[in-house]
Amino acid sequence: MKFFIDTADVGEIKKALALGLCDGVTTNPSLVAKTGRGFEDVLKEIVQLVPGPISAEVTATDYEGMLREGRHYAKFGSQVVIKVPLTVEGLRAVKTLTDEGTKVNVTLCFSPVQALLAAKAGATYISPFVGRLDDISQDGMAMVADIVQIYRNYGFKTQVLVASVRHPVHVLEAAKLGADVATIPYSVIEQLAKHPLTDAGLKKFLADWEKVPKAAK
């Protein structure tokens, strides 16, 4: 399974790259707003850093606007993937952009049927939002399981990119289900490396090491 980092913070991207845990990047307007920077400046910098897929989201909601923004952002680098919302207008844009050779990530997916439509339209990635479904007392990972099964049934090439990841269990369940990608906030990447028994074991090893006679200098 590939790990994308879900951020527009260049500092976080650099840290994830240093760990070897950044196969790609996903951004959205909310993440860009947190940086206080212009989106195009952020995108240009990320393109220089990351060789893998970089999702750049359009803000237009109409077909022509999505095409205009998508074509513009696609010029920033061959690794740029255009992110469009799962709406009727968005699906039209997916079909056109895909036919033009542009990779597309369909975002804000909340049902397996929506994911089926995205795959039929030719999406490169589908982004089911598991955390937001959990927030309304539905089962986000059950949605992912259904999407993975449907795609396998019919041999769709669209990759399942699990999004709205809130904690390590989401990552674990995505991996068990066979999702292609999980896009993960840097804070969750750090949590993945932690376990209380690891900390306790390290503490004990170091304490025991202090008891070992040391050679005289």
Curated annotation (Swiss-Prot):
Keyword Transferase attached:
yes
Q: Where is the major localization of this protein?
A: cytoplasm
- Subcellular location(s) per record: Cytoplasm
Could you say which EC number(s) this protein's record lists?
2.2.1.2
**Mind naming one GO cellular-component term on file for this protein?**
cytoplasm
Its domain of life reads Bacteria
The family this protein is said to belong to: Belongs to the transaldolase family. Type 3B subfamily.
Q: What does this protein do?
A: Transaldolase is important for the balance of metabolites in the pentose-phosphate pathway.
**What is this protein called in UniProt?**
Probable transaldolase
